[in-house]
């Protein structure tokens, strides 16, 4: 149910059950509240708009020695905790963790490249076996 809250000139503001609607684009004596600033679109209301561009976070600079030490540690103790892996994946841009765990375009490209490499390796192996 909506309640109409109206100034004397009846230009109309409305209060819905969950939101304010209608009203002023500019604050004035007739409209002391800038209603559009209080309006909240319903879920999915921005679905067809172009999404904002996420700024890539650069990877932490690592020296070769640090990388080697990390590899050795993983070899000794097993893979790091999943949270750390996801954090690294987010920094690389493979996953967009604000939404569902779907691959981002960068992650999709990386996965496609890896798949192509695997197919090409299999083809090369097949050729080597035939030529022998």
UniProtKB/Swiss-Prot annotation:
Post-translational modification: Cleaved near the N-terminus by the viral protease during virion maturation to form the mature protein.
Residue numbers covered by the propeptide annotation in the UniProt entry: 2-23
Site feature location: Cleavage: 23-24
Classification via InterPro entries: Adeno_VII
Extent of motif Nuclear localization signal: 124-132
Gene Ontology terms, MF aspect: DNA binding
Induction conditions: Expressed in the late phase of the viral replicative cycle.
Annotated keywords: DNA-binding, Host nucleus, Host-virus interaction, Late protein, Phosphoprotein, Viral penetration into host nucleus, Virion, Virus entry into host cell
Single Gene Ontology BP annotation: symbiont entry into host cell
Gene Ontology cellular component annotations, sorted alphabetically: host cell; host cell nucleolus; viral capsid
Function in brief: Plays a role in the inhibition of host immune response within the nucleus. Interacts with cellular nucleosomes and immobilizes the host immune danger signal HMGB1 on chromatin. In turn, prevents HMGB1 release out of the cell and thus decreases inflammation. Also plays a role in the wrapping and condensation of the viral DNA. May also promote viral genome import into the nucleus.
Family the entry assigns: Belongs to the adenoviridae histone-like nucleoprotein family.
General remark: All late proteins expressed from the major late promoter are produced by alternative splicing and alternative polyadenylation of the same gene giving rise to non-overlapping ORFs. A leader sequence is present in the N-terminus of all these mRNAs and is recognized by the viral shutoff protein to provide expression although conventional translation via ribosome scanning from the cap has been shut off in the host cell.
Quaternary structure (record): Interacts with the core-capsid bridging protein; this interaction bridges the virus core to the capsid. Interacts with host NPM1; this interaction might play a role in placing the pre-histone-like nucleoprotein on the viral DNA or regulating viral gene expression. Interacts with host HMGB1; this interaction inhibits host immune response.
Protein name per the record: Pre-histone-like nucleoprotein
Biological source species: Canine adenovirus serotype 1 (strain CLL) (CAdV-1)
